[in-house]
Amino acid sequence: MTAVSLLLAAACAGNRPKPITVPPTATDAVRPAPGTVQEGLASWYGPGYDGRRTSSGEVFDQDAMTAAHFDWAFGTRVKVTFLATGQSCTVRINDRFPNHKGRVIDVSRAAARTLGLIGPGTGRVRLEVVP
């Protein structure tokens, strides 16, 4: 009887499902305080997404000053500065993207144009939450 119990326990121990990592939803997103700063890699998106729904439910407009962030709350306003040039703009978070090592934000085509990111496609940025 003891041997059977041990076999059953051992058989069940290896069948645990792996946790699934998903981007935060609107209810568990982080509401950063004004002045919060983050640095990392930025990229941009637009063609292929224009007119589609964002994670917040808004229709994506590649010509609006918006961005996707992994876990900052929708509606958060962020000053984005391209460190290579010092160019900056303010965007509103309205979308999510999968967590990628080093990447902190995906900006719309309009924001990328203002920052000078269209050509290089990616660049190091400083994010600062603004009121």
Over which residues does each language-model region extend?
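Secreted/periplasmic proteins
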Residues: T2-P131
